[in-house]
Swiss-Prot record:
Belongs to the argininosuccinate synthase family. Type 2 subfamily. The gene is argG. GO terms for molecular function: argininosuccinate synthase activity; ATP binding; protein homodimerization activity. L-citrulline binds at Y102, N138, R142, S195, T204, E206, E283. GO terms for cellular component: cytoplasm. ATP binds at A20, F21, S22, G23, G24, L25, D26, T27, S28, A46, G132, T134, D139, D197. Its EC number is 6.3.4.5. PROSITE patterns: ARGININOSUCCIN_SYN_1 (PS00564), ARGININOSUCCIN_SYN_2 (PS00565). It is found in: Cytoplasm. Pfam families: Arginosuc_syn_C, Arginosuc_synth. This is Argininosuccinate synthase. PANTHER family: ARGININOSUCCINATE SYNTHASE. It catalyses: L-citrulline + L-aspartate + ATP = 2-(N(omega)-L-arginino)succinate + AMP + diphosphate + H(+). L-aspartate binds at T134, N138, D139.
Amino acid sequence: MNQNHTILQNLPVGQKVGIAFSGGLDTSAALLWMKLKGALPYAYTANLGQPDEDDYNAIPKKAMEYGAENARLIDCRAQLAHEGIAAIQCGAFHVSTGGIAYFNTTPLGRAVTGTMLVSAMKEDDVNIWGDGSTYKGNDIERFYRYGLLTNPALKIYKPWLDQQFIDELGGRHEMSEFLIANGFNYKMSVEKAYSTDSNMLGATHEAKDLEFLNSGIKIVKPIMGIAFWDENVEIKPEEVSVRFEEGVPVALNGKEYADPVELFLEANRIGGRHGLGMSDQIENRIIEAKSRGIYEAPGMALFHIAYERLVTGIHNEDTIEQYRINGLRLGRLLYQGRWFDSQALMLRETAQRWVAKAITGEVTLELRRGNDYSILNTESPNLTYQPERLSMEKVEDAAFTPLDRIGQLTMRNLDITDTRAKLGIYSQSGLLALGEGSVLPQLGNKQ
């Protein structure tokens, strides 16, 4: 093995190789293949609270059956909840369509998985890591970055980048036949019209039929909630209250949760009953090619709505503007696998210190169907929203008088005069036509 190469293109025979093991066809076949070819596979499974996983404890047992030297289940749920709350606090969501956001649930899961699994491998003196990400996607770069951040001595071996593996087991049928030929009664599951990846924060549905934009959200079977577009699915309006303390969600419907994992699970149940947080997005992958995904994130959506309501009621306009600008930038860094880079930590610390710390209060909403909701009440000891300041009724001790406003408007004459002068300059240079038919038809041609 060339010690100068971080990415290994051939199986490191006789050496320990860690594999992120899901128990599915791909990783099962890869683990057995590596074992038979002479490597020493170690299996690591992340418990991320995936809504479509029934029995986590069975996965390491399955890995041992396929030939793993050792198999470990790593509980990542508490850390995932922590990072999910941090993303809410920072508004770290840069992909949206029509005001409906993608909550970066897969990038958050990769940040946790990539660091915690490699850390567990270090404990076992395993310094070679493989996972199931393909060369066309985002995850190959995310895992690469997080893995090397956690263990600078790490080497990467991916069977899906090994030509020998591809030649021998290049497809699902070949992998299934390989397992059967080696004495494993593997029954290949019915292939869906799309691929699904999930964790406690959300689910991603993509690829196959969803690569075509004429295949809509209706072909997806939600795993975290209901198909809100189906008129046969009865959805009753439901009131829900969300309480924050210093930027952290702590209670739902008056019930406090000491465990953030349980808090997220309950938020998912509430939002999922309505299909809240589902979206259809076209996004730019890290390599600048566009992809399309259908996303679920009922709990994240519920917390985001309540959090932003409190943000707008507590903070001033400039703070809100900076929160949004920084959130867009931080969302991109998170998406790119840079959640723990210094530039991301700087943006996170800013939002968590100067925005989130003031967010204490409770928001009550009515959830209906899909992303249809109403805000019914907003309460906080930190609200700067004071209706008496702008009341249309006569009030005593008014915050300002008509004379105060006259003075304020008079001061505006300074920049209005400057603006008219600039428009005149633009007109004289031919950049802007004034008068009839122009974009500013009423200004005339005189300065």
